[in-house]
Regions:
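N-terminal export and membrane-targeting signals
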Residues: 1-17
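C-terminal region of N-terminal signal peptides and the immediate post-cleavage residues
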Residues: 6, 21-45
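N-terminal carbohydrate-binding/catalytic regions of secreted carbohydrate-active enzymes
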Residues: 46-146, 301-327
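Surface-exposed substrate-engagement region within the catalytic domains
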Residues: 56-79, 199-322
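Extracytoplasmic/secreted envelope proteins and their assembly/folding machinery
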Residues: 93-100, 104, 137-144, 176-183, ...
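Sec-exported extracytoplasmic/periplasmic mature domains
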Residues: 101-105, 115, 144-148, 183-191, ...
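Structural preference for beta-strand elements that scaffold enzyme active sites
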Residues: 107-111, 151-155, 191-195, 221-225, ...
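Active-site cleft segment of glycoside hydrolase catalytic domains centered on the general acid/base Glu
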Residues: 129-149, 158-192, 200, 206
């Protein structure tokens, strides 16, 4: 049976130190895998180790926890767990600079998820993105300027490579070019660890995804991210990640464990869209079981809707307190 007191002990305890530091309480045809560059530009030392991850004191989860009546141990635990700050069109260089600067002042690593590629989400529940390639390049320039020399982790364009098949040939090439541009621009700050999103193991074969990652010069980044906003188990994603790593000159990777505590929902058309019965996964940590896994992270923010899901759910990105509480309950 779920115990609210137990939930706090299990979920918030690992991050009291973070909060204190931050000054807060609160398969298809065979694929030809393109060659990866022989020399990695990123230092092999884990850039996510040795410092806590930043807790956003102004997140939707934090606001919900602060205003919960009666108080919710589950919401407090989730709010005080480090999660990604999503950068979408409209976010300014000043916004990025303030967020990363606040994290730096707190002695913590900020985690950003950049989500603004043209034709984003192929017109699905999180459709949007910048209108043109030039707009996107200028936006990336602004983000890089905002990050500056701050030690930062970046998840670059969730789903963009995995979803590229929905595009025309010209649009697909433009997408590869834009992600490559973002990798090159963001990694000019040697303290920025960039992870290009690589989908998950049920979407593309390791060979296919490695080929896509090599096309965007993943070897110039720290590596790639897996399972973003999805539910596949950490063990399964480690197997997938190690296979991709072997095809991308030893790239490192991170895994989104925010909602994978009991794995995915049974197969169905929209089993990824606000499925019931899912659970919080391992809290963020750089202590992993994968040889090339830098960290388990909460990239998706637990409690935020995946979209309307063709059933009248709240729009994508809307924080729903009961959904967050249900994820905590399912985690036990």
């Amino acid at each position: 049976m779920f115990s609210a007191a137990g939930a706090v002990a299990r979920w918030i305890a690992p991050f009291l130190t973070v909060a204190a530091v931050a000054g807060m309480w609160f398969l298809a045809d065979p694929v030809q895998v393109g060659p990866a560059p022989a020399v990695r530009l990123a230092d092999d030392a884990n850039p996510l180790a040795g410092m806590p991850f930043y807790v956003n004191p102004n997140s939707a989860a934090m606001r919900a926890a602060q205003h919960a009546d009666p108080p919710s141990a589950e919401l407090a635990a989730i709010a005080n767990t480090p999660q990604a700050y999503w950068i979408v069109p409209g976010s300014s260089a000043g916004t990025v600079a303030k967020y990363t600067g606040d994290a730096q002042a707190a002695g913590a690593i900020p985690l950003l998820a950049i989500y603004g590629i043209p034709h984003r989400d192929c017109g699905s529940f999180a459709a949007g993105g910048l209108a043109t390639a030039d707009d996107y390049r200028g936006w990336i320039d602004g983000i890089a300027s905002g990050v500056g020399a701050t030690r930062t982790a970046i998840i670059l364009e969730p789903d963009a490579l995995a979803m590229a098949d929905c595009l025309s040939a010209d649009q697909r090439q433009e997408r590869y070019d834009l992600i490559r541009y973002a990798v090159d621009t963001l990694t000019r700050n040697p303290a920025t660890a960039v992870y290009v999103d690589g989908g998950h193991l049920r979407w593309h074969s390791a060979e296919d995804m490695a080929a896509r990652l090599n096309k965007v010069d993943v070897a110039r980044a720290r590596g790639f991210s897996l399972n973003t906003a999805n539910f596949f188990t950490t063990a399964d994603e480690i197997g997938y990640g190690e296979a991709i790593s072997g095809l991308t000159n030893g790239s490192h990777y991170v895994i989104d464990t925010s909602r994978n505590g009991v794995g995915p929902a049974p197969d169905s058309g929209l089993n990824w869209c606000n499925p019931g019965g899912r659970a919080l996964g391992t809290p963020p940590t750089a202590a992993t079981a994968g040889a090339h896994a830098d960290a388990y992270l909460w990239i998706k923010r637990p409690g935020e809707s995946d979209g309307t899901c063709d059933k009248g759910d709240p729009p994508a990105g809307t924080f729903v307190s009961q959904y967050a509480i249900d994820l905590a309950h399912a985690a036990g």
